[in-house]
Swiss-Prot record:
Keywords: Ribonucleoprotein, Ribosomal protein. GO terms for biological process: translation. The keyword Metal-binding does not apply. GO terms for cellular component: cytosolic large ribosomal subunit. Homodimer. Part of the ribosomal stalk of the 50S ribosomal subunit. Forms a multimeric L10(L12)X complex, where L10 forms an elongated spine to which 2 to 4 L12 dimers bind in a sequential fashion. Binds GTP-bound translation factors. One of its GO terms (molecular function) is structural constituent of ribosome. Forms part of the ribosomal stalk which helps the ribosome interact with GTP-bound translation factors. Is thus essential for accurate translation. Belongs to the bacterial ribosomal protein bL12 family. The keyword Ribonucleoprotein applies. This is Large ribosomal subunit protein bL12. Signal peptide: none annotated.
Length: 127
């Protein structure tokens, strides 16, 4: 079998439907035992002349799930929405609380995630 170049692969992917791509990603994850979870938030580059005083004000936060509460299934659903984890991974995260759900995200994203988790019945900490 001839080796396909990156351009050839991209051309093939362009012809696929979203459902076909989704099935491909699932098969790829199973074959190579990896996950294709997207990064939840990306921090912007730090300023070149960032002053040490800026360290006083925290701009990256972690959302820690401290407990699932009574509505564990709802919490698992919210964790999956926030992280793009699979069902098993999200369940393991919820069962293994306290665990970080999101790390190094902006204050707004951390607050929104914490609010969603609390609405589902989880106990959450933002650090």
């Amino acid at each position: 079998m001839a080796k396909l170049s990156q351009d050839d692969l991209l051309a093939q992917f362009e012809e696929m439907t979203l459902i076909e791509l989704s099935e491909f990603v699932k098969a790829f994850e199973e074959k190579f035992d990896v996950t294709a979870a997207a990064a939840v938030a990306v921090a912007g580059p730090a300023g070149v002349g960032a002053a040490p005083e800026a360290a006083e004000e925290q701009d990256e936060f972690d959302v820690i799930l401290t407990g699932a509460g009574d509505k564990k299934i709802q919490v698992i659903k919210v964790v999956r929405e926030l992280t793009s984890l699979g069902l098993k991974e999200a369940k393991d995260l919820v069962d293994g609380a306290p665990k970080p759900v999101l790390e190094k995200v902006a204050k707004e994203a951390a607050d929104k995630a914490a609010e969603s988790l609390k609405a589902a019945g989880a106990a959450v900490e933002v650090k």
